[in-house]
Design a protein with these regions (language model features):
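Core beta-strand elements of the Rossmann-like FAD/NAD(P) dinucleotide-binding domain
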Residues: 2-5, 246-256, 260
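A conserved FAD-binding loop/helix module that cradles the flavin
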Residues: 492-511
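A glycine-rich dinucleotide-binding beta-alpha-beta segment and adjacent secondary-structure elements
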Residues: 184-187, 191, 223, 228-233, ...
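Mid-to-C-terminal "cap/lid" subdomains and adjacent gly/pro-rich loops that border
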Residues: 36, 48, 60-68, 255-261, ...
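N-terminal glycine-rich phosphate/pyrophosphate-binding loop and immediately adjacent elements
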Residues: 2-122, 133-134, 278-298, 304-312, ...
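Internal hydrophobic alpha-helix adjacent to the cofactor/substrate pocket in enzyme cavities
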Residues: 416-421, 506-521
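Helix-rich C-terminal "cap"/substrate-channel and partner-interaction subdomain
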Residues: 139, 363-440
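Conserved redox-cofactor binding core of oxidoreductases
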Residues: 108, 116, 122-229, 427-428, ...
Length: 536
């Protein structure tokens, strides 16, 4: 007889993991994740032996598929993403985390909230009127308390960030300090390596925070469990079928099935389950953030690129009229630390003295990373879980990125280059002084061969099933008792890393599930928690 739970959550990342921590005390919850659960009690600043081993013995095989017939590495799914209209047969590898904690377990830890223009854009795109800064404020505050979100004392800032801020401000460019969700960070310099788990448990992922909370409350977590189908009977989600340890198992859900497999995985699971036949919006409206690094060489060898936390500050590239563009610059977060793919070129592992020695060879490097937050392009996710196709054609028919994206990126590269020149940089790549056709081609090649980060919107929330997949709370228009809770439901593209918004929308979903699905009406909402703190 199949096991039965009140709620089944498919995916233990930023969305599903956060949701689980908030609802597990109020009903029986099964959490399924396709990746491993790296065990050990959280020890911020030290790390559990299991997570230390995982973080220090990762190699390129973690990112690449195990074989030609698989889209899985050890900790990641890898999907083909087609980005270049001028070369329709070429694809890049889009990697999505496959580990308990999901993207929150391997991201850089930068915590940015959406801007006002984003909230306005949600309503413009799908008509939602309650996706507002005010409505989400308590949920951001709840998440920020749980994840220890803060800004670093300037004594811990990377040297390049200190000088970058000073010079940018002198040029009239508004600079913002970047918050992050870390605790007891030892500033090892590895947080730049997006895709690397934190060796020292300092990155406050859901694997460190909400998943342990859910397990303590009685939830069941099954790792290495790949969901293959949502069980739907008479238009009602009644459970899921998953594969684990060579067995195929069906688990029943009395009240709710939650898809939280990310903006790529969730629409694929809905497609595998036939939901796209009921709602053609499934997998459509893909938004993402293509980006480029800029690296510079500076005089001296005391820039300490192998230490510190590089995501200290950010700003928008500014026009001559002082207007912000949609290109966001993170400084000094170029590639001044050796990333996994660079380390692979040196044929070393991502651990031990050989790895650190490579990082320390480049003592005069600094840089920034530039994201284009609102490209004038919309993509889609099609195919199946085992044979997915992602189309995000930001590359135009003549080998150059679409106009808005390339114009914003060229402006940003030139502006960042000028700042670094004033810091003393004697070379940069890409170089804003290069002829514009050369610069545009360089950046276009980089973007269309490296992918686009932060996918969003593939099961977007709205007020009309003709233009959306779920309602404002994430509940499916077409299948009763089915919820989506991850970046896929974001109604329109945002001007920030999505991690903060995903956790805030998951907090909001948790209040809804506790109250409306589980009937726990005496449980404090996020707003209740904030009001209680105010009166203490």
């Amino acid at each position: 007889m199949a096991d039965t739970y009140d709620v089944i959550i498919c995916g233990a990342g930023s969305g599903g993991g956060f949701l689980a921590g908030e609802i597990a005390a109020n009903g029986s919850v099964l959490i399924l994740d396709a990746g491993p659960h790296i065990m050990g009690d959280p020890k911020p600043g030290v790390g559990s032996p299991e997570r230390r081993k995982t973080a220090t013995q990762v190699n390129l095989g973690t990112w690449l598929p195990a074989n030609r017939d698989s889209n899985r590495g050890d900790l990641f799914f890898t999907y083909p993403m087609y980005m270049d209209q001028s070369n329709p047969f070429a694809s890049t590898a889009q990697r999505e985390a496959k580990v308990v904690g999901g993207g929150s377990f391997v991201n850089v830890g930068a915590w940015l909230r959406p801007r006002r223009v984003d909230w306005d854009g949600f309503q413009e795109a799908t008509g939602v009127t309650d996706w507002t800064k005010r409505a989400f404020e308590a949920h951001f505050l709840r998440a920020e308390r749980i994840l220890n979100v803060h800004r670093d004392s300037r004594e811990y800032w990377n040297k390049a960030s200190v000088l970058y801020e000073r010079i940018a401000l002198s040029m009239g460019i508004p600079i913002f300090e970047t918050a992050s969700n870390r605790q007891a960070c030892i500033f090892c310099g590895h947080r730049l390596n997006a895709g690397m788990p934190c060796k020292y448990d300092a990155l406050m992922s859901t694997a460190i925070t909400q998943i342990p909370k859910a397990l303590k409350a009685g939830a069941t977590l099954l790792d290495n469990a790949s969901v293959v189908n949502i069980e739907i009977t008479n238009g009602i989600a009644t459970g899921v079928t998953y594969e684990r340890n060579g067995q195929t198992v069906t688990a029943n859900a009395r009240k709710l099935v939650v898809m939280a497999a990310g903006a790529i995985g969730t629409p694929l699971l809905l497609r595998d389950s036939g939901v796209h036949l009921k709602n053609p919006n499934v997998g459509q409206h893909l938004k993402a953030h293509p980006g480029v690094p800029i690296d510079v060489l500076l005089p001296g060898d005391d820039w300490g690129s192998d230490r510190g936390y590089q995501w200290n500050i950010h700003h928008h590239a500014m026009t001559e009229n002082g207007e912000p563009t949609d290109a966001v610059v993170h400084a000094s977060a170029g590639f001044p630390a050796t990333t996994p793919w660079v380390a692979a070129a040196f044929k070393i592992g991502l651990f031990g003295r050989p790895y650190k020695d490579v990082m320390r060879q480049f003592k005069s490097r600094a840089g920034a990373f530039i994201f284009e937050m609102k490209p004038n392009v919309t993509g889609r996710v099609t195919g199946t879980r085992k044979n997915a196709v992602i189309s995000y054609l930001v590359g135009g028919p003549y080998g150059v990125l679409e106009d808005k994206t390339i114009d914003d990126l060229v402006l940003a590269v030139r502006q960042v280059g000028e700042i670094y020149k004033k810091m003393g940089a004697y070379t940069a790549f890409p170089n804003g002084d290069d002829p514009e056709p050369v610069l545009k081609q360089q950046m276009s090649l980089f973007v269309t061969t490296s992918g686009a980060l932060h996918p969003q919107g593939t099961c977007r929330a709205g007020v009309d099933p003709k233009t959306s997949v779920v309602d404002t709370w994430g509940m499916s228009w077409d299948v009763k008792n089915l919820m989506c809770c991850d970046a896929s439901i974001i109604p329109n593209h945002i001007s920030s890393n999505p991690n903060a918004l995903i956790m805030a929308l998951s907090s909001r979903a948790a209040d809804y599930v506790n109250r409306e699905i589980l009937g726990a009406r005496n449980v404090r909402t996020a707003a209740d928690e904030i009001e209680s703190e105010v009166h203490q």
